[in-house]
Every structure is written in C-alpha cells, then in structure tokens.
Amino acid sequence: HNSGGNPENIIDLTHDYLVDFHRKHYHPSNATFFTFGNLNPAEIQEFINKNVLENFEPSNEIISVKNEDRISKPKTVTEFYNPMPEDENNHHVVLSWLLGESHNPVELLESYLVSNILLDNSASPLRKVLENTDLGKSLSPLTGLEADHKELVFAAGLEGVDANAQLKVEELILNCLKNVVSNGISNELIQSSLHQLEIKQREITGSGMPYGLQIMLSCLPACLHNDDPLKVLDLDSSFDVIKDRLNKDNYIENLIEEKIINNPHRVNYCLAPDIEFNSKNEKIIKEKIDKKSKNLSLED
C-alpha cells in the first residue's frame, strides 16, 4: 500500500487515534539530522536548534522497531489478486527467509554475497535453475535480498506457475540449495561475486542520486535502530572480516545452510489469481462504509 494506507482499514480510523499517532511519531525527537559537504556542522546544528527543536518539548516516547518473533517451522501463506484476462492461471510462488539485521554491516555484506552468488547472473546456480525450469514463466520480482527493513529477507520464486505446481516449485528451490551446499561453490564464483559486491558498495555514481544522499541513506538504518552509523561507512573493516572468514573451508556453503536451508523462519508464499478479487473487496468496503455511516451521529 502507498502512504495513504489500506482503504478498508481507514474506515475504522478515529480522529483521536490519528492525533495521538501524529503526536507520538511526527516529533523531532524521532528525527535524524544529516549534513554533507564542506559545511560548518556547528552552524547547521545551531540553525536547526533555533528554528526547529526549540519549538518543541522533548518527547519521552521511545519509538523502536522490535525484531519479528521467530517461527519454529515454515509457514504457508496464500493471498489473492485480480489478474489480467490472459493471466487467470498465473500464480506467484515465492519462498522467503528472515535473516539477520540490516544495520549490522558484516551481516549485511554476508547476506548480499550469498544472494549474489546464488542469483546474480544466469551462471549463478539458483538463478540458472529458476530460469530453466518449465514450472513457471519467469523469476518472481521478489527474488533476491530485501535490505530496506530492520531485518533482512532473502526470497526466491517464480511467476506464471500453474495452480497445482506450488509444491514442485518449493522442492525445486530447496533441492537446488541443498545441491549447491553438497557440491560446493567454486572459488572463482565466490571471488567474482565478492569483487562485484565491493565495486557496488564503493560506487559513487550510477544510482541516480547525489553521492551525499547515498551515504545518508546507507547510514539511516543504523540511526533508526540505535546502532553506530559510522560502522556502515567503514567498508574496509567489514570487507576485511568477510575476506578473513572466506579463508575457512566451506564458509559460503555453511552460510547457505545456516541462513537458508536450516532456517525454520521461512514463509512459503503463493499469490493466486481470483477474477472476482476486486469486486469482492469493493463489496466488503462498501458494506463497512454503509454500516459505519448508519451509526454516525451529527457530532461524528
């Protein structure tokens, strides 16, 4: 959903809740201020303090994002969408695993390295299997590492899957991962993936954003989750840790086994087509609005 929220839930939103939420969350005590460039930080801080912070009372609210409660065995979830006319049997099947925290730079680089090795190009083992199977039309757009939240998520799957092929897709992915671990990964692939990761992490241009903004956004997760943002900028130390660990036998294979294969916090997700999905949803919303409207007073 976009920032407007879920229309069905907006019906239940009260004015008091909205005001309280705004008071609690939209407060400078929750803000992180960045400066970049050849500027005098003291002058910027004085300006912010005079024009912003002095206009507010300090807030005692502690805003923090808790880690997801871990599940002890994989969970299967099915949701629905309204398909295009030619996609009535177009199922999306995705397996996703919850990993470590995104604001830990070594954990983040490890996870990126594993994802790159498995999925970066057509020669990568998991991508090769997914691209060459007849079980689906193409890779799911959810495939890869999601690093925009507090905890990392690794996902792999297909779109264009027949209704009766979900279990086959799950078996295909899990068997591929097990084969990668048992057969081993070539040092050439590992070093190539590491080299590409270093280039990408150190890249100054190419993202379409100013370099200063890139740095700020890379530091933001650590700021939001009460960690040291300077650790994120110290790429050399983090890569040195990774390179040192790569000297151990089967380091990447062990990571794949630990983070993915033996990780019970897995969701087997299926997005299934339903040509009546939109009409059903609109009916539910209309019924809620009608019920709500009947109970409204003039003061409401």
Give the location of each predicted region.
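Short, low-order "capping/linker" segments at domain edges
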Residues: 73-83, 201-205
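Polysaccharide-binding surfaces and accessory modules of carbohydrate-active proteins
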Residues: 62-77
